[in-house]
Every structure is written in C-alpha cells, then in structure tokens.
C-alpha cells in the first residue's frame, strides 16, 4: 500500500504488546484487530523479540511481514510503537560471534535460549544491534501507522557480565572517575585489609561469594548501569538517523539502572510494572518518580491485565475493576499511554501462563471489558487529560546513589531504602501532588524538598543547589540518615555529616544506630513523637528545637531542629518518624480531606479521586463539585466505591 509519514499526536492511548510473528496467520491477525477495535485499543508495540524474523541470515533483512501487519493496523486506525529486537539475537549470530554471550561470575558463558543474556560491552553485539536498528528505522520510519520507537527491553545491571570486555571497561571507568590509582586507594581506604591496588587492572570485579569492599561493589554496579545507558544511547542514535518520532526504552521499577542517565537521550520515559493485586500504591510511587524526569508525559509500556507469571499464574486474583483502576491510576498520575502485556497469550515457549487480554485460543479474558470501560472514561475526559499536567510544589528525593549505597552498607539493621520511602513517607502524601526526584533534578518548580535517607548530598552539585534553594525561600526537610556518606559509600571523617551540621546550626552529640522502644520523644507542645530504628541527638548551635528526646542518654537533646537561612529554612530530622509527622512539618493543606484508601491527583482545577484498596472510601468536599464521568453533582461527605474513580470540578 502507499504510505506517508504520520506525525505523533498528544493524546491518551490504551494498547497492548503484540507478537503477530509467532503465528503469522492473517485470519488470526484480522480477528485480533477486530477485537482490539471492540475494546478501544489504539496502539500496539511489537518487534522487540523478532530479530530472527527480520534477519534470518546475516545481512539478509526482511521487514515485509511487519510492513504487512502495520498496513492492516493502519487501516484499523491502530498506531504502532516499533521496537528494536536487540534483547534476542538469533542463533546464527551467537554461533559466529560467541563473545556476544555474557560471562557468568564463574567464568562460564551463558547459553543461547533466553533474552537479555548478552554482553553490552561486546563490539560484535553492538555492531550487529546498530546494523539492524539502522535497517528497521530506514525501512519503517515513514510508515503512517508508526508513532514511536522502543529500543531494547527492560535493561538492567542485575545480571552482570564478567567477560574481558567488561573487566577492561570497568578499569577504564574507574580511571576516568578517580584519575590515578593512588586517589582510588585513598578514597576507598584500601589499607583496611591490605587491599591496596597497584593499578586499575588490579581492581577485580566483585563476586557474590566474597565479602567485598562496599565501594568496589557500588562502583561495579555503577559501571554496568553506565555501560547499559551507553548501549541504549547507541540504539537511539541509530534510530534518529532516519526518524524524528519519539524514542524510548522500557524500564522496570528498580533503581539499579539509573533512570536519568538511561533517559538522557530518550524522548519519552517508558515503564513496565507488575504488582500484587492489592498493591496499587506501589506503581503510584513510581509514577511520581517517572513524571519529573522529562517535560513530556511518561508511558506505561507494560502492565498486567489479570494475572502475572513467568512460570505460572501468580500475584493474586484480580477482582472486579482492578484492571480498570490500574489503567486509570497511570493516566491520572500523568501517563499518556497505558499498554497491557500482552494482547494474546502465547501458545508455546516461556511465560506460557502469563495473563493477557485474549487467551491463546483468541477468547477475551474475564475482565477485558474493563479496558473498554477505562477507554470510554478517557474519551469523556480527553481534553482534561491531554491538555493538563500534574504539577507539584513538593518534592521528595529518591536517589539512585542512596539506593546503591544502602544495598552495600547498613547504618542500621534492616534498612530497606525503597520500602522506607514508599511505605513510610510517600504513602503519607497520597492526598497531595508530590514529585519524587533524583539528585540531578532541577529544583526551580518546588517550594518544599524532603530528603529522607539521602545518604549522599554532595553529588550532581546538589549541596550547592540546596543551599541556594533554602536561601531563596525554599523549605528543606532533611533526614534521617542524610548527608552521611560520600558517593562511594564511605564515611566523612571530620563530622557525622558532610556539611549539614554547619548549615543547619546543630552539633550531633549522640548517635545510637540500634532500634529500641526505650527511647521516647515529643514535640515542643508536649504531643508524643514516634521515633525508631536509629537516633541522632542534637545540641543547638544556631537552630531551634521542634522536638526533643525525653528518655535515656538522649534526654533533652533535639531530634527535630529548624533554622532560618536567608528567606527559607532547613529542618533536620534525627530519627525515623512517621510519614504523618513529615506532612505536619511540610505544613501544606491536602487537595481534599479523604480516607487513606483514596488517592487524589490535582490537575489544574480538576481533582481525580481513585479508590485503590478495593474497599469503600470517602471524601469531604468543601462546596459543590461535578463528576465529569457521571455528570452528577456532589457536596459534603461523599462515598467512593471500591476500585472506582471520580473526576471532580468545583461548580
């Protein structure tokens, strides 16, 4: 068919991952497209594992099948996100270039047969990935069904390669960072166990059966994340030689792979998530992190329709409207695309019993109608959802460096950085718009920045920017366990903190990194303050006390302090406190008063209310509001049914 380029348009799209190359049957494809239209599916992503379909033999490329499918999709008014197939090189490539397979820490090469088991440092692998990416972009870039590209799939440094390319790359990475080996030895304190290195080639990648130096483990993780990001950027560069459509790479909810670094050259942040049936606050946490990375809306490129399962169905039965609310939550929080994995269950191979929109025999899953329900809602709210953004003047730091550091050193037993931020602090702000940001994020948009467990403040120029932020009128709520480590997971030697004592007007007299119920505290007004897990007690050297310890060795010492600096103020927290107490320190009013199972999102003068725990919730309305979805008006104390949504505008 004759085709012409179609420009990408900003609008809410619901879609599915599609693998037509598995069956290669026109009758099945036609039935698929008919059912997609029935549900309101407007976009598919495909091609990510199809290398052997596109290049059966080296240098012999054939995209005719995918052009044929894309022609059908275009006729059905369904858009395409086409993916590079780099996660699954074919057998001929492995046979000829065996060095493309990653090496396990025991020295064995991985075996052909899975995905993402390939070395991102391998010159042959990078060359072949670049070649097929070029070919795909050159041949498909002008197809009218195409709206965007995805490169690779769920890249992660968790499965590390120990080949000679990666070892040399690691040595070069360390040399670039530290300059000379003496500086590395000094920074890591290698005299500790006679670990002194003579040159960078001496620095051996850490194996899991060794009690490794924390700085070594952290930098090895950092190297693989950087190497992966460079690999992704090469794919993006290949695509952009032939196309100006948006390019992204789909990532998982892990901080091992640095999101900001990986998305430096992408046009859109892409995100895959699968969670327990009752755990919708967890993706909400990640949406608040994804949204500030770029100025453009993020895309959910994979999420479950019903059950998950790499090996068997799991993650819990999806009760009525779970799929509906999961879809709505992403869009309410700022997603522009929500794609289910996947359209049709596989009839063979890995992930055989992972849920999908259709069964392998082509029948709708039991909750497929919820997709259409969400699509119909989005149509009613299309102007609101396409023309407004989620904006916040409150930010909370969620740091890749802190995540990595607390994985290799533990200031107190059982410190789970992600769990503490998610469960302890972020959850308390479910009735506020809040951004989660890494340390390189600009602070201009915010009035208040919260930095719990921000182990390293002295990176990406953050220390200097936080000082200016406060002086210019911002409120910085920092701690506990913040500014306690350098970026290589080593301590400061002149004070417990890097610069916080001097800046915040405090002196740390006592530190107890051990949980106990003996230590108590209270606010200055006498109300009890819950403290736990670790305890820093402060003497005031310019700050004022907001809360003090009332027992044990810490009695009379401050646990929360405040100091005015310029037009703003810095508040330091010396123990793990409840999220509600952090909200008290912020001092802002919520969007509305609502029960804890209700998530609220404000977008200009609209409020989206979502019940996310599958039980009845409630909201207190000040005035009369109209629900855009039902066209009904409400006021006062109202009920929100389980897994339901209201889009409210004040009358």
Enumerate the language-model features and the residues they cover:
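N-terminal carbohydrate-binding accessory modules
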Residues: 1-43, 56, 71-72, 79, ...
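Short, well-ordered coil/turn segments that N-cap beta-strands
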Residues: 10-14, 40-42, 74-80, 142-147, ...
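The substrate-binding groove and active-site-proximal loops of carbohydrate-active enzymes
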Residues: 14-24, 49-64, 111-130, 155-159, ...
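Conserved, mostly hydrophobic/aromatic
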Residues: 16, 36, 44, 73, ...
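Short, acidic/polar
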Residues: 23-38, 131-135, 251-262, 319-327
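Aromatic-lined substrate-binding rim segments of carbohydrate-active enzymes
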Residues: 30-38, 45-108, 234-242
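Polysaccharide-binding and catalytic clefts of secreted carbohydrate-active enzymes
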Residues: 106-268, 282-283
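Carbohydrate-binding surfaces of carbohydrate-active enzymes
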Residues: 200-203, 274-651
């Amino acid at each position: 068919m004759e085709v012409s380029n179609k420009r990408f348009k900003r609008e809410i799209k619901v879609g599915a991952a599609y693998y037509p190359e598995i069956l290669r049957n026109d009758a099945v494809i036609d039935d698929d497209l008919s059912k997609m239209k029935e549900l309101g599916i407007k976009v598919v992503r495909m091609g990510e594992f199809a290398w052997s379909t596109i290049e059966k033999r080296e240098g012999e490329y054939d995209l005719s099948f995918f052009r044929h499918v894309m022609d059908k999709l275009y006729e059905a008014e369904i858009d395409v996100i086409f993916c590079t197939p780099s996660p699954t090189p074919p057998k001929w490539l492995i046979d000829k270039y065996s060095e493309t397979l990653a090496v396990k820490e025991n020295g064995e090469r991985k075996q052909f047969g899975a995905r993402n088991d390939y070395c991102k440092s391998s010159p042959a692998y990078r060359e072949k990935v670049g070649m097929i990416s070029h070919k795909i972009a050159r041949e498909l870039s002008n197809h009218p069904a195409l709206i965007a590209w995805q490169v690779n799939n769920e890249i992660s440094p968790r499965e590390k390669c120990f080949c000679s390319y990666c070892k040399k790359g690691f040595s070069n990475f360390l040399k670039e960072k530290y300059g000379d080996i003496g500086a590395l030895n000094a920074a890591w304190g290698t005299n500790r166990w006679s670990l002194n290195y003579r040159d960078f080639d001496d620095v051996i990648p850490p194996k899991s059966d060794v009690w490794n130096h924390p700085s070594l483990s952290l930098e090895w993780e950092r190297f693989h994340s950087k190497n992966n990001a460079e690999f992704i950027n090469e794919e993006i560069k290949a695509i952009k030689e032939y196309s100006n459509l948006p390019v992204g790479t789909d990532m998982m909810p892990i901080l091992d792979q640095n999101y900001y670094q990986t998305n430096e050259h992408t046009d859109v942040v892409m995100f895959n998530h699968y969670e327990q049936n009752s755990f919708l606050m967890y993706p909400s946490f990640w949406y608040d992190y994804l949204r500030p990375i770029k100025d453009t809306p993020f895309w959910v490129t994979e999420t479950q329709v019903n059950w998950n399962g790499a090996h068997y169905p799991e993650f819990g039965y999806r009760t009525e409207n779970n799929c509906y609310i999961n879809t709505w939550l992403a869009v309410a929080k700022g997603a522009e695309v929500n794609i289910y994995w996947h359209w049709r269950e596989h009839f063979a191979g890995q992930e055989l019993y992972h849920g999908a929109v259709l069964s392998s025999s082509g029948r709708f899953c039991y909750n497929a109608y919820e997709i259409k329900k969400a699509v119909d809602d989005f149509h009613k709210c299309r102007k609101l959802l396409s023309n407004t953004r989620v904006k916040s003047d409150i930010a909370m730091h969620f740091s890749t460096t802190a995540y990595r550091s607390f994985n290799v050193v533990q200031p107190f037993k059982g410190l789970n950085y992600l769990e503490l931020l998610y469960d302890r602090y972020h959850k308390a702000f479910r009735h506020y718009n809040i951004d989660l940001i890494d340390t390189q994020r600009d602070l201009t948009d915010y009035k208040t920045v919260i930095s719990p467990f921000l182990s390293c403040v002295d990176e990406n120029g953050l220390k200097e920017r936080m000082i200016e932020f406060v002086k210019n009128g911002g409120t910085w709520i920092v701690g506990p366990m913040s500014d306690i480590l350098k970026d290589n997971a080593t301590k400061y030697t002149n004070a417990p903190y890097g610069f916080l004592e001097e800046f915040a007007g405090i002196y740390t007299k006592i530190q107890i990194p051990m949980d106990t119920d003996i230590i108590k505290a209270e606010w200055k007004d006498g109300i009890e303050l819950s403290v736990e897990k670790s305890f820093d007690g402060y003497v005031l050297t310019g700050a004022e006390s907001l809360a003090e310890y009332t027992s044990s060795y810490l009695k009379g010492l401050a646990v929360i302090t405040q100091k005015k600096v310029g037009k703003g103020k810095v508040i330091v927290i010396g123990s793990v406190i409840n999220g509600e107490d952090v909200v008290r320190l912020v001092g802002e009013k919520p969007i509305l008063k609502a029960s804890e199972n209700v998530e609220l999102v404000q977008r200009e003068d609209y409020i989206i209310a979502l019940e996310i725990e599958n039980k009845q919730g409630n909201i207190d309305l000040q005035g009369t509001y109209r629900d855009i979805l039902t066209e009904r008006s409400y006021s006062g104390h109202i009920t929100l049914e389980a897994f339901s949504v209201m889009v409210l505008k004040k009358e």
